[in-house]
Amino acid sequence: MTNLNYTPTIWTRADALKVNENDPTTTQPIVDADFPVMSDEVFIWDTMPLRSLDGTVVSVDGWSVIFTLTAQRNNNNSEYLDAEGNYDITSDWNNRHGRARICYWYSRTGKDWIFGGRVMAEGVSPTSREWAGTPILLNEDGDIDLYYTCVTPGATIAKVRGKVLTSEEGVTLAGFNEVKSLFSADGVYYQTESQNPYWNFRDPSPFIDPHDGKLYMVFEGNVAGERGSHVIGKQEMGTLPPGHRDVGNARYQAGCIGMAVAKDLSGDEWEILPPLVTAVGVNDQTERPHFVFQDGKYYLFTISHKFTYADGLTGPDGVYGFLSDNLTGPYSPMNGSGLVLGNPPSQPFQTYSHCVMPNGLVTSFIDNVPTSDGNYRIGGTEAPTVKIVLKGNRSFVERVFDYGYIPPMKNIILN
């Protein structure tokens, strides 16, 4: 279908050594421990604003809509009560991934979110977990394609179509009752479960390339090959100073940002392409990749963790970015290292799962925040929105907004 001939860009160990966790221009401001919670009934984490295929965050008939990974808070479940009857929120929070469901919320203000409920009825999704993706408003009739990840057993990129309906009172969803599997890891470009039981393959983010008008998708993957078989050569190392050439067990880290191209704009058939960016020997996770198109350039963002860095490297939980003049690269790591917005060292787990929107606003969720008594408070709710400014290959934190502030960039009046 496509003659895209390109070589993946390598995020090198030398690049990652430049990560500076103490640079205030790339550090997310402190989240206070007295943060508000969206719901006492559910946890939320990965947030997916409704958008168009060019990345524009949209509202419908004046209603903003977000989709979230969601799990019930089991505060009355005996499984999560200790001997004194106290709720063990930490265990409940840590176990959320196994029961993740995609739900939706709506708002007139771009905050003050109202819970709408499940997107898909129980049993519609063919696997036990509904993991993150991207909801796309297709037209003024209110049709939505929700691209997401079907997980356990396996991991498959999929989509499900439904419709958004509005009234003066709120928003409802209809349809979303037939899931279409699109593709799984191929073992040629992207690692499969048989090659690595800890493989990553998820987080579809479709988009129209502003240059050629075709429909593409980026997603998280790992570079194909048996676990531990990857070689960290000169290209993966980059130009390293003395004392930094021992890679330890870095061969186990093989994250990449994958890409696929659709046969047509329906998005029903896809061809898997080589990765855009690889992180062999650097990091094992490049989650929730997504593009911002600005000034004729391609800003490719992803999120990653401190704990998924390879031996000899470190960096904060947060957003990492790469810049190119072309869709297929080559890409250069933003700010020299790739780090765009990281948690502060004093609160390394305060936020995660950032989504950079074309207006520079960055949404994320609160994970856990230290408290004055030396403990910590679990979040499971929206974090304060941060604005960053992109200037060529550099980025700067500029402002903090309210919790969960995700304003629309465009309002669509439905037919």
Swiss-Prot record:
The record marks D203 as: Transition state stabilizer. Pfam families: Glyco_hydro_68. The active site is at D46, E287. Optimum pH is 4.0-6.0. Its EC number is 2.4.1.10. Disulfide bonds: none annotated. Belongs to the glycosyl hydrolase 68 family. This is Levansucrase.
